[in-house]
C-alpha cells in the first residue's frame, strides 16, 4: 500500500513556509497555538457572515427577476473572496495578522478592518498586545487551490454536474501561470448510493520532487446526499 503524505508538510522548509512566526516558552506554547486558531476562525467567520449579508441585500434590493438571476450567476465569482492563508507574526507588544485573499471587496469597505479588530480583541482578550491587520491581494487568484475548491463547491450546491464543475475549474486555471493541476472529487457523486472518486489531471505533477512548488488543499462540501471531498494539487514551478 502506498503511503500518502501531505504535499505541503512534505515541502515545509524548502518551497513552503510556516504561517505562524513567533517564539514561546514550552509551558506557553499550547496557549499560543490556541490563540492562533481563534484568530483564524474569527476572521473566516467574519468573512462568511458579511458575505451572506451582502448577498441577501442584493437579492432584496433588486425587484425585477432578470436582475436577480443575473446576480445569482455573478455569485460564482464570490469564490475569489476566499482567504488563501492567514499569516500571524507575534512580537512582545504587537500581533501582526496578514490576510491573503483573492478579491478583498468586503474588507475594503469603510470600517471593516476596525470592526474585525474589535471582534478579534474580544475573542483573544489581548490586553498587553495590540492588533495590526493588513490585507494582501492575491495576484493570481485562480492559481490558489482554496479558491478553485470554493468555486467547485458553489457549482455543486447549485446542482451543477460534478464533471462540468471540474472542467470549469480546470478552465479557470488557464488564466494562471501554472505547469500542472489535478482535481479529485470523492463521495456520493450525482446522488449515487455507492461512493466513488473521479479525477481530472492536466500537465505535470511531480509529487515526489521536493524542490517542486506544489500547492494543495482538501475541502469538504456538504450536499443533500452527504459530504463530498475535494482535493486539488497545483504545480506552480520548480526551484
From Swiss-Prot:
* An example molecular function term from Gene Ontology annotations: structural constituent of ribosome
UniProt GO BP: translation
Tree of life domain: Eukaryota
List the GO terms this entry assigns under cellular component, sorted alphabetically.
chloroplast; cytosolic small ribosomal subunit
Main subcellular location of this protein, as a coarse class: plastid
Q: Which residues form the KH type-2 domain?
A: 43-139
| Gene3D superfamilies reported in the protein's UniProt record | 3.30.300.20, Ribosomal protein S3, C-terminal domain (3.30.1140.32)
Q: Where is it localised?
A: Plastid, Chloroplast
Task: Write out the ranges of the annotated region (Disordered).
Answer: 50-80
Q: Does the keyword Plastid apply?
A: yes
What PROSITE patterns does its record include? RIBOSOMAL_S3 (PS00548)
Q: Which UniProt keywords apply?
A: Chloroplast, Plastid, Ribonucleoprotein, Ribosomal protein, RNA-binding, rRNA-binding
**What Pfam families does its record include?**
Ribosomal_S3_C
NCBIfam families assigned to the protein according to its UniProt record, in alphabetical order: rpsC_bact
Instruction: Give the family, as the similarity comment puts it.
Output: Belongs to the universal ribosomal protein uS3 family.
**Quaternary state and partners of this protein?**
Part of the 30S ribosomal subunit.
Query: What protein is this chain from?
Result: Small ribosomal subunit protein uS3c
Q: Which organism is it from?
A: Lolium perenne (Perennial ryegrass)
Q: What is the lineage of its organism?
A: Eukaryota, Viridiplantae, Streptophyta, Embryophyta, Tracheophyta
Gene name, Swiss-Prot/TrEMBL: rps3
